[in-house]
Amino acid sequence: MFRARISVRKLTSVFLAALALLPGLAIEQELQLDYRINEHIILIPAGEDHQARLETTVFQPNGPGPFPLIIINHGKDPGHPNLQPRDRFYHMAHAFVERGYAVMVPMRQGFANSTGYYHDHGCDMTANGYTQAEDIVATLAYAREQSWIDADHIVVAGQSYGGLATVALGTQDLPGVRALLNFAGGLRDDSNGCGWRS
């Protein structure tokens, strides 16, 4: 009986130690980058006085460019935005890089490892879209300053909440932006009694 108790304690200790390592393993897996398509992460200034930093995954073809650019905007997972993992849209990015495009996937303020704050305007979907579009504007401004980007050939795309933000972005003057792509744009918000189905 004494030996069985020691074995259970050892097993429990090993199990708890393994659980403690899991977040580190998840972060390590998340940070694995595909250098074959020059994947890297940058921080783009955004927000009031450019105090926030947008964690942005970049993919680009080999060579100095300039390359046409597609900016792909993410949706929102249920729960707190800072718990959402970094989006990569890897397969889409890979397809565009193979066709000579650079790709940026910015995580907007408050999402994943981006700093700043996520602003929730409740049921006012117009305000939600415009607020999220501000971070896309910051990404565009940063991109236009890069010598490896063709600032006259930019496409902005978005999926779900990123699609809503992309459509909101379209109300502004966007020099060099040739297309806006919306993939099932919108925001489902059950928490505020928004009645999103109506």
Annotate each predicted stretch with a short phrase.
Residues 29-65:
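N-terminal cap/lid segment of alpha/beta-hydrolase-fold proteins
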Residues 66-75:
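Short beta-strand element of the alpha/beta-hydrolase
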Residues 73, 106-108, 183:
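Alpha/beta-hydrolase
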Residues 77-89, 95, 105-131:
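Cap/lid segment of the alpha/beta-hydrolase catalytic domain
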Residues 124-147:
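Alpha/beta-hydrolase active-site loop
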Residues 148-160:
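Alpha/beta-hydrolase fold nucleophile elbow
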Residues 163-174:
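Short glycine-enriched nucleophile-adjacent loop
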Residues 179, 184-198:
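The feature captures the conserved acid-bearing segment of alpha/beta-hydrolase catalytic domains
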